[in-house]
UniProtKB/Swiss-Prot annotation:
One of its GO terms (molecular function) is 3-dehydroquinate dehydratase activity. GO terms for cellular component: cytoplasm. NAD(+) binds at residues 42-44, 80-83, 111-113, 116, 136-137, 158, 176-179, 187. This is Pentafunctional AROM polypeptide. It comes from the Eukaryota. Disulfide bonds: none annotated. The AROM polypeptide catalyzes 5 consecutive enzymatic reactions in prechorismate polyaromatic amino acid biosynthesis.
Amino acid sequence: MSIEKVPILGKETIHVGYGIQDHIVTEVVDNLASSTYVIVTDTNVEKTPQFSKLTNDFTKVLNEKRPDSRVLTYSVPPGENNKNRATKAAVEDFLLQQGCTRDTVIIAVGGGVIGDMIGFVAATFMRGVRVVQVPTTLLAMVDSSVGGKTAIDTPLGKNFIGAFHQPQYVFIDVSYLESLPTRQFINGMAEVVKTAAIWNEEEFTRLENFSKQFLSVVTAKNPDLLSIKEELVKTVLESVRVKAEVVSSDEKESSLRNLLNFGHTIGHAIEAIVTPEALHGECVSIGMIKEAELARYLGILPPVAVARLSKCLVAYGLPVTIDDKLFLQRVGPKRHNIEIDLLLKKMSIDKKNDGSKIRSVILESIGKCYQLKAHEVSKQDLTFVLTDEVLVHPFKQPPQENVITPPGSKSISNRALILAALGTGTVRIKNLLHSDDTKHMLAAVAALKGAEITTEDNGETIVLKGNGGDLVTCDEELYLGNAGTASRFLTTVASLVGKSESNDHVVLTGNARMQERPIGPLVDALRSNGSEVQYLNKEGSLPLKITAGNGLKGGRIELAATISSQYVSSILMCAPYAKEPVTLALVGGKPISQLYIDMTCAMMKSFGIEVTKSTTEDYTYHIPKGTYKNPAEYVIESDASSATYPLAFAAMTGTSCTVPNIGSSSLQGDARFAVDVLKPMGCKVEQTATSTTVTGPPRGQLKPLPHVDMEPMTDAFLTASVVAAVAQGDSSTTITGIANQRVKECNRIEAMITELAKFGVKADELPDGIEIHGIDIADLKTPSIEKRGVCSYDDHRVAMSFSLLSGLCKEPVLILERSTTGKTWPGWWDILHSKFNIELDGYEPPFGTDKEGTKASDKSIIIIGMRGTGKSTLSEWLASFMGFKSLDMDVYLEEKLGNDIKSLIKEKGWEYFREQEAAIAKECFSKFSKGYVLSTGGGIVEGAENRQRLKDYITAGGIVLHLHRDLEETVSFLSVDTTRPAYTSEVKEVWLRREQWYDDCSNYHFYSSHCNTEEEFDHLRKSFVNFIKIITGTEKASIPSGRSAALSLTVPDLNAISSQLGDIAVGAEAVELRVDLLKETSSSFIADQIAVIRKHIDLPIIYTVRTESQGGKFPDNKVEELRNLLLLGVKLGVAFIDVELTAPVEVIEEIIIKKGYTRVIASYNDIAGKLGWSNVEWTNKYNQGVSINADIVKLIGRASSLQDNLELEVFRKQNTLKPLLAVNLGSQGKLSQVLNTIFTPITQESLPNEDGLLTIKEINQIYFDIGGLTAKKFWVIGSPIQHSRSPNLHNAAYKALNLPFTFDRFESTDADQVYKELINKPDFGGLAITMPLKLDIMKYATELSDAAQKIGAVNTLVPLEGGYLGDNTDWVGITSSFTRAGVPPNPRVNGLVIGAGGTSRAAIYALHQIGCEKIYLANRTTSKLNEIKDSFPKEYNLEVLETEDQAEKAQNVGLAVSCVPADKPLDESLLQKVEKILANGEKSSNGFKSTLLEASYKPRVTPMMKIADEKFKWRAIPGVEMLVNQGDRQFQIHTGFTAPYDVIHRAVVEE
């Protein structure tokens, strides 16, 4: 038995060995005399053979040597959640009960939880007793057991209460690891890697080399630790030595010991959020990488060190990112809780901080920390490192001169790795690009056993010993991310691979984008040469399954090389290993990127194989058989494509930059960029054979480049494009020769055009290029953060290019997916920050925002459904709302084939038509994949190929929307439709055949009610648009911040009460559909019920299927039916879905994954009232709801006494992480229903009510009775106001909701009088303000809304704490009047405001909020209009129409607001202007009827309305609608309640 002793604090008290239980017992009994030895462990360790042996031996030896002493054992529950005050107290109570005294020796046997907590017990029991640590997990052995730190957790964080208490001994018996679960084993390696990373580079290198053997042993079904015993003991020993040395220098963590916290500042914060699902080491592993990236960002740690640390952690099976696949599986929905503000909050209360200043350990190199202490780091820098979105601030003071060395070339790096792996001998590769691409390539080479790979020079040099092309298959898929180069090179390499004992094929796969990128021509060439390659998903793209053992036949290979030169290079490099010499003929025209092909040939020559070009045939190469001979050293040239970014920075900012190792002799085509692009644009360029310097002209003086062929340097076109964006002159900049850029990481040409437009730069697509119309730097627009800034498309070159243009804007610019630059330049942002002095900020989007940046709304939406279900009409509505183009695929087919469908079927039959339909579907889904609504023919689901294509579209993240309506209505419509071919069978039969297909092939479903009137059509459109908002994420349902109620609809069929629904829903902010109480639960019936609600109520729908055990009617044993019903709710696009926490875990998880933008209410119902609110089970259920990231947690109990309600309120105050809906049912539970704030379940007298729910009137009355509501007085003020309808409106709402408020008139023209007599009274509730006080009353407003500020007047005043809020709701009256009249959101028309009075300013504000791109102003005189125009921001784009000619030229006006007096004759000159505009209204409306709103409500029909309606066929909205709608919003501001709209409308309109 070998035992290593490690000194700490001057004593050799740390003993390390394998199987040392006997030594532990002897050492303790001989040297630590005591009357009582207490062995404390947890219930897991208690069951291990090692623990049994330890306790048995202890008892035996104690009886022999100290017969008067006793040994006690005590077990605690396992897990971090039991490391708390309660468990500590339980241990202490046990010790006291057993009569333990100060001479007690406590032996803590277990993992970190036991060591920390029992050490703390020892530190405080009897003011301190002796403790011995016997760690049983790897993490405890190398970390928590050494150094004397003890602690317990609190709700606010880990280890906040504890003490330093050094153990008498630490006995590390590595044999305990034999029973350690694999995940715990790997977890401990994080701390091992950490200690080596901060202290011992030599040990770190050993760990790098040990990883593969370690992982293979610990992940085996029956791990054999004896096979790695020596290495394992050394691993523990070296880590312990580091910690012991550090602790000996700084026992109480005043300085040096802080180094042990590397990775913990961020890691602990993550752990606090995702514990217990994620383990300590897993979180610290992520923390180490983030803190290493921080050090790199600060310019201290080299990029290669970050890459090396990351690779080592991954090699031990540890996560290095929050979005690691396995980490995400483990933490589940808690991933959504990892938000930057919460992380920073957790970090700010870290123990090593200096007050609230966050401190972190900064790594300088592997094995060394910067200045041997923790450093204060800014929240700004931390936010940047912790987020994947970046705000690039304006380039204010960049250095005048700079020298930047880009990382190694990606192209050369990947080629060098392939050649070296296929070669024989050892090569030292220097300046290799350490990026995602090369990481995937290295991993693949290692997995295929192509080479032995090690590192030297602190990771700067890769030492690769090639196996001469002798590769074998591996069991796992080779995942390549979005590494296009690696995927193409490895496809041919995989064809050379031999079979292993366990596998006969290689699978290459990648991320979603990689699975869209083309590889077909290469596969075709390989197949023709004997390789067996199978597509596993989409034809022409990864994943690929390549059968091993076939190899390449050799001989002549023909390859299409007009798309990618990488296909050519892939075959070239592998050709020497074919069975016969290869002649590679490139067919289809001139190959793309010839210089890259030349590069490959030159590199092959460096590795001993010379390629010769054919002298008789163009684009043809002869490659001999042979084996590469690896050179002793190969230096990778810096990446010329990457070098374009710092050089372009100099060009755009008027500064100078030198790239010292890329010049005219470079192998890379992109080395020409400075000379061929920047120099003609006005830059001074100095280029030698090995270096390039660019000096830009004064900022803003770049010249456009009329034409440049960038075929030799296609990747650099993106950099050229952003330079051209700010190059002004007589011409545009035209770039050609870049057709291949459409099939890179994204369609780069399309991406460039789309993103440049966000900066106000117009660009046009050319057949093989792009034309850019540069603008003045001062005219650059700042892309909207709200609209998600600049999308990078997961493309490194897009992100880096736009980082340059962003800095020229006046405001910070948001760029998404910044980490995508890791493909070629992981440290690009660090260079911008540390070398160019650019301010960067991390950015985290608001919760619920699509973090991909490419919103669901960018992707085309496909519409399916039976003929006659409204596909054409609803498609137009959808296209109008989304800003998409609408394409009827039947019409497209007819145009393409030159024949109408009816004739086509008559002539050639249904089978031919279906074949053509399938071909058109394939074309359209690809060609029109973005920005379209694709309306399909009713029978598209008849063909299996089309059905699969629709399913694939859904899998790829697209929306396929199934539209349906009442079958009888459909039959009636089709019976008179003669424009389409007749069905070969009855309509009902066709529907029954297709019904399941429609369901299988769609992920959303909208059931449209039959409409008879224009009003019903308007309402249908509004409800349809609301549905679209939810399914596209354009607008998620809001969670009320104030008191709110939800009406529970408990009837078996809503059709029976449909006409009453508006009145029944008074007082509700949402309606709950109890699906389990419906008379049937077929999908069609439920869809009909949802349609009924949407037809009659404009409220969010809560979709609930309550099971029997939870108080409902749905059978508990029908789990699959429950799952299907919940998924149906998501498919129907409801705002909220109720998910019972008692449902099977797999059902809950599936709903969470597939919910889209529907919000989740996690519910639990204790219908029997068995649980009191002090029972821990309620807390467990609440936490369960939080853990699945529910939007609301709903807990329902049953009260048997008043006390139950009071306990519930205590519970409510204690649980605030997520909004809580908690009430008690039954007659005793009414108080809880009154005190609940979010979506309180309510009923109406006419509805069944078995649960004792209250009506909204009852709730408000009781709330008033107990003091929750106080009586308030509201007034309308101004003069004259005797005819004001505001009192009617507000008092009707107060009565309907039973609110203790009154609303009256107060006629006055004196604001001071109003303040004295109304505002300054204790019962003052608020004002509705009319002329002449809209301006005068503003002096009493301590805060103004944005609307009030821009409109320059207030019509609403309410008290705030310490002051008053002034608001203006006139604009809401305008916008709501338009939308309720059928005007869609984002109507994409221009607006017209008639008049120049006070209301005209509200109209301008309203039309801008609606989305009018331009707003025309017309009035009798224009002087006042010019004043109004000058007072609004430029982006309102206001144009004053001074003449009739100008009015006639006004374009695309579809909305108008008349703000001229209605009781006076219309001015003739003004009328002439208005009529010129109204006359063009029919062609201006964008899918809706052009609409005019009258601002005057007397008379009901004004002269302007008559002209608009009768003469020009515009829709005219009377002013009374504006009055109602502004009052609706005003009521909400006054009271916090939602106004009952139908009630207030009747009160005003029917007066």
